[in-house]
Structures are given as C-alpha cells and as structure tokens.
Amino acid sequence: MLSLSHPHPHPASTTAAAAARHHHRRNAPFAPHHRRRRRFAHLTTSAVILGPDGRPIGGGPRDNKLPFTPPPTAPPDQLYQPFHPPPSPLPDKYKDLDLGQRLAVLRDRLGLWHEYAPLISALSREGFTPSSIEEATGISGVEQNSVVVATQVRDSLVADEGGFPAELLRYFDSYGGPELLYELRFLNARQRADAARHAIDRRLEPRGVRELARSMKDFPQRRGDDGWEAFTRDNPGDCLAFARFRQSREAIDAEDSVAELERALEVVDTEPARARVEAELDRARRKAAGEEVDDEDGAANAAAAASRPAVPVVRLMYGEVAEATTVLLLPVVREGDGGEALAHAPRRTRTDADLGMVEVDKGWTRWAVVPGWGPVAEVAGEAVVIELADGRTLPWRSAEAERVLVVANRGRREVVEDGIYVVEREGRLVVEKGRKLAAEGVGEAAAEVLVVVRPPRDEDDMISDDEWD
C-alpha cells in the first residue's frame, strides 16, 4: 500500500510545530488559496509497505527507506530452477584447458580438425578476431572459416535421421576434409548426405564437389527446361549430368557441346536421363561432323520454343481490375481438385450487362475477377480459372516461382500441336503443350489455355517482351 507521509521530525520540535500551525490558522482564517497550498510544499512522498496487520514491514519508526525484499522462494510443491548458462561447445577434453593451452592446441593442430574447430568459435566469442587468432596460431582467416563451417556440415551429417555411416564419415577426417564439406554448406541435410556419398564414391576434389553442390541447388529452379523431366531430382549424378547437359546447349562450338555431353554421360545414373543424354550426344556428333540435323531430331527450335509460351502471359498491374471498363467473374478451381471439379465448375447461363448481373447454373465458393479481355470474354460461358501454387510447373523456361491463374476454355478440348492445354495427371491439373500431348497420343484435354495471369509486382516493366510468343 502506498501513502503520503510527513518526514519524521525531531521529537522535541513536534509540539512546538503543531502549536505554531494552530496559531497560524486562527490568525489568518481567510488566507489566499495559493498560500494555503504552500503548507504542503515541505511534504515528501515515500512508499510504505504495510503487512497484514496494517503495520509497516521492515525498518523502525525513524526509517523511511524501502525495506529489503528477500529473493523469491519456490512453493513447497514446486522445484525452483535457477538460471543455468548454456553448455560449453568445447569437447570434454578441452574444457579444463586455459587460454595458452587452447592456443597451443590450435597452433600444433593437436587432434582431428573437427575436434579442435570448436576452440576457434570459443575464442571468437571471447573477443578474439580472425587476425588475432591467425597471429597466435598461424591458422589463416580463410582456413578458420572453412574449418568452422565444415564442422557444422559434418555435425548435420552425424545428426541425419538416416544415419550417415560412420565408416564413410571417416573419409573426411583427412586434412582436405574441410574443403570438401565446406562446399556442401548451401544444401539441406538430405542433399548433403547424398552429395557426400557421391563425392566419396567418385573421389571428388573440392572443385568437383562445388560443381556437384551447385547443380543440386540449381536443379529445382530449372523446372520446365527442355529435357528436365528425364532427370531425377533426388539423384546427385542426374543433377550434375543435367547441369552439363544444359551447358552443352549453351556452347557455341559443336565440339564443346560434344565434350560437355560426354562429361554428362560419365556421371548420369538413371536410365531415362542416360537415354536423353545419349540422344543429344548423337545429334551433337552428327552436327560436329557437318551433317545436316533436322529440327525434329533434337532441335534448336525445340529449345527456343521451350523458352517462351505459346499463349499470352500477363502480369497484372496494381489497380488494373478496378480501372477496367469491363470485368469478368470466373469460377476458380485449385490444381489439386482434379479434372472432375474442373468439369463441374459453374457455367454462365445469363448476363445482364446494363446492371452488371451474372447468373450461373450452380453455387460455387471460389471466384476470380479479371479484366474483360477479348479472347476470354468471347467464351465467358465456358471459361474457368485454374489456380497454380507454383508457376514453374508451366511448360516454358520463363516461368517463375509464384502463384499464377490459368484462364482456360472448357468448350475447346481437342488437342492440336500448336495449343496449350490443361490435363489431369495423377489427380492434379497440369498445363502441357499440345505437341507433347499429341506425341503421347492424347487427343482430348480438359480445357484449352487462353491466358496466364501473374500477380502484380513493384516494378516498372510489368510485362516483358520475352513473355509473348
């Protein structure tokens, strides 16, 4: 409880002071208000803690200080747990060493590299800089970083759920082990384990491990590239082979293209990928020999066609729908809903353009509003929107990792080679080129793609020229 209290005066002056105040009140009963308020100018405020009986706790009557509060204690039925510092990252055999001994361990490289690497991290936390550690131990800053990062990669292999074999882990105990594991730092735990096994099987050097890691990291981003489907994402050899396969496409000289494909053939693992590389290698060798190579054999035109869509790809601008003269309200189907949901999506039965009313044949929960583009407005009764969570599933290279809407016409399902279509594969709706469907013998699709809509983005160039066929 808080209260206002007067400072404790000397006992001898208490009676005199009280009499003086009483005399002053009788002689000046009509003193101005501001003068009366000055009587409280000498008061001070202090905090007094009262106990259950109403008496102050702590000091005596002359003590106006806050009483000492003892530290909290746990109730009898609870266990009090004081703060404990985090465990030391140092191995047990280094915990009892003083600073000089720790520096000696690093200076003389006493033990395996992943055993003394925690000493570098501990010194950094104690205020040592890489240059001061180098001056004291002779380990350069680059090597310090390599050893510390490689230790973290090695720890992730040890903690792998699949259990990285201990006999394989010893392969990296050599002096060059940190350089190999350092290159795997950008991969996730599963990819690191696969890449480490591949590096051991092929006895790769740091440069080869770097190429392998980059190919595994880059492979998912290349979805939609020509030949990508033939390679396996979870196979390190296929990822590396696809990287070299792609480099062969970028080579200007035919001999360089053949050399890259031969290198790809050395590391490819799965049969579909091997067949794709061999077919491309045969074409490249005939081209290098001066033979005329038709576009259908493997074709430069196929690569160019794969790089751009055959339908308009539009990136919306902020406020474009609100400013449009006419808009269309279309039902939306998720890619995971399958072909049955696409077929049963509502169709427009009546439109009142004057009042802006639309009548459909059934209820629906998801709708999209798009500008009234001419090709879509002409088939608005059969139009439907397919929502794709990842635009990279689209069959062209310029697709990006973003959500997209595919506007399709259900009234036109016959497959022709020049078209783009929506088909169902394993219960999911996907977009495929008519040329590929025709080669597979597919004569009818779920719908024909009219336009692909991309979300707005904060940049001036909303629609790039290479997005159009």
Curated annotation (Swiss-Prot):
Coiled-coil region list: 246-294
Pfam families: Raf1_HTH, Raf1_N, RuBisCo_chap_C
Region C-terminal beta sheet, annotated ranges: 311-456
Compartments where found: Plastid, Chloroplast
Record region (Disordered): 1-78
InterPro entries for this protein: RAF1, Raf1_C, Raf1_HTH, Raf1_N
Compositionally biased residues, Basic residues: 20-41
Any Gene Ontology CC annotation: chloroplast
Region: N-terminal alpha-helix, residue numbers: 90-281
Record-annotated membrane-spanning stretches: none
Keywords: Chaperone, Chloroplast, Coiled coil, Plastid, Transit peptide
A Gene Ontology BP annotation from the UniProt entry: ribulose bisphosphate carboxylase complex assembly
Residue range of the transit peptide in the UniProt record, numbered on this chain: 1-46
Entry similarity comment: Belongs to the RAF family.
Main function: Required for assembly or stability of RuBisCO. Acts at a postchaperonin step to fold and/or assemble the large subunit (LS) into RuBisCO.
Swiss-Prot/TrEMBL domain comment: Has 3 domains, the N-terminal alpha-helical domain, an extended flexible linker and the C-terminal beta-sheet domain. The N-terminal alpha-helical domain stabilizes RbcL dimers and RbcL dimer-dimer interactions, facilitating RbcL(8) formation. The C-terminal beta-sheet domain probably dimerizes Raf1. The 2 C-terminal beta-sheet domains are swapped and pack against each other to form the dimer interface.
Name of the protein in its database record: Rubisco accumulation factor 1, chloroplastic
